[in-house]
Amino acid sequence: MLILFSIVLSACCLIALTSQRYALAAVLLMGFIQDPFRKLVAGEPIFFIVTVGVVFGLLMLKTIQSIGFARSIAPFVNWVDYLYKPLTFFVVVLLIQFFHSLFRWGNVVIGLIGLLSYVAPFLAIIVGYYSVNNLSDVRKFMKVYVSFGLLVAGTVALSFSGFELSVFREVGAGLKIYDQGTILRSFSGIMRTGEIAAWHIATTACLLIVLYTTSTRKHSLLLIASLMVLLLLAIAFTGRRKMLMLVSVFGLCYLFGFFYFRKTLSAVSVFSAGLFVFMAWLAVEYFFPGGYSSDVQNYLARGASVYSDASDRFVELGLKPIQWAYSRVGLFGGGLGIGSQGAHLFQVSSIAGGSSEGGLGKVMVELGLPGLFAIVWLMYAISKYILSCIKLASQPFVSSALMAAVLGFAAFLLVNLLTFTVASQIYGDMFILIILGLVSGFVFALPNLVVNEIKQHSLAQHERSDF
């Protein structure tokens, strides 16, 4: 099995270095197959989870080599100057805390793990920025990702249905959830944990909606509704209910964005939304003609409880960990990596304790108050830039499809930022960080996409006039 994986890894690395057209697909392929291969190898070696980083790293080096190092920071300084100062301050804080971690814990790997978790999305922004020239390129990426995500959802559903395969079990002992007066199993499909599977399935649901709204050929609403039902059920079967909230909030933000920036919702849009809900109901009736079984009801009841528990969980996992972090390491943090995935391998995770469960607490325990300020300042600047991109996309000379894509990506990034505040550990996964960075890069590239779209439109008009 290791030999087969080595062959696939080598092929993906070669594609990343030689093919601009299929490079992102190679990254996605490696990201989705590294977990099932890990399950099938004796001992479940941990190195599998970073192999997607190898493929992505080669693509990043190729990108920087082709454009030059000076141009690699263009996504952050090309269009606005207010990103430069918070980004510079953030980098300075990271470097200080890296050396703090090195001298305090005496292990360079701890600091490198933490550094990678903060830097990876920004490296992916550079790759995403230079990987797309038009909306068609963005849609190709989404199509490949959604295809893999539907596969993950299908394997979760199969696992729930009773198919016991080695590739379907969770890595390690597996997670048991005590809820609804019983013990629920977290089904992970081909991914290594139910939480990882849930995030990718939720992301698939979000991108499927964006794909539909940016398509010039509207596919069957019944098909889309059926796929959404499958995805939402698969999320419920993982037991990771926060991802149901992610999809729900995404849908609300996306709808609000259309209403706010387009100033109105057409009758066709309202009718389509109503028809979509009706088709989803038909799909549920088709899949469960006799009603839900008790097993399904337990998972659905757990999933539904996320909405009533949301405010309490935000306080307990979003805000209180900041105070816990201060009590453990003080105002200036304990150094990079002590709250990151993998810290337990070096006996330092106990320093962070439960304070690293939420995103704000993780930043506080690793980077201290200066790092928390740096993150908030940087997120404000990035949000300001993304808002300017949305305003640009809402102009009459920009196609509605490009507007829909930018709104969708902005909503997707927003809900992930909110989820990070209460569940940071999932965002220590290399593949997830790469996906978030790539999507951010697509948004950062919007001015380029608009210019290219106008050029293509002008060229088409010129050709028609000549004809």
Predicted regions and their residues:
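Interfacial loop-to-transmembrane-helix boundary motif in multi-pass membrane proteins
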Residues: L29, W79-V91, V119, V127-L158, ...
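Long extracytoplasmic/lumenal interhelical loops at the membrane interface
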Residues: S293, N298-L367, I390-A393
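Hydrophobic transmembrane alpha-helices and their immediate junctions
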Residues: L367-N416
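Transmembrane alpha-helices of multi-pass inner-membrane enzymes
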Residues: M60, C206-I209, V247-L252, A381, ...
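N-terminal hydrophobic segments of proteins, predominantly signal-anchor/transmembrane helices
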Residues: T18-L40, I49-V119, F467
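A membrane-periplasm/extracellular boundary helix in multi-pass inner-membrane enzymes
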Residues: F160-E164, T238, L255-Y307, Q323-R328
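Alpha-helical transmembrane segments of multi-pass inner-membrane proteins
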Residues: V8-C13, L95-F98, K140-E170, D179-T182, ...
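A conserved mid-to-late transmembrane alpha helix and its immediate loop/hinge
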Residues: T193, R240, S349-I386
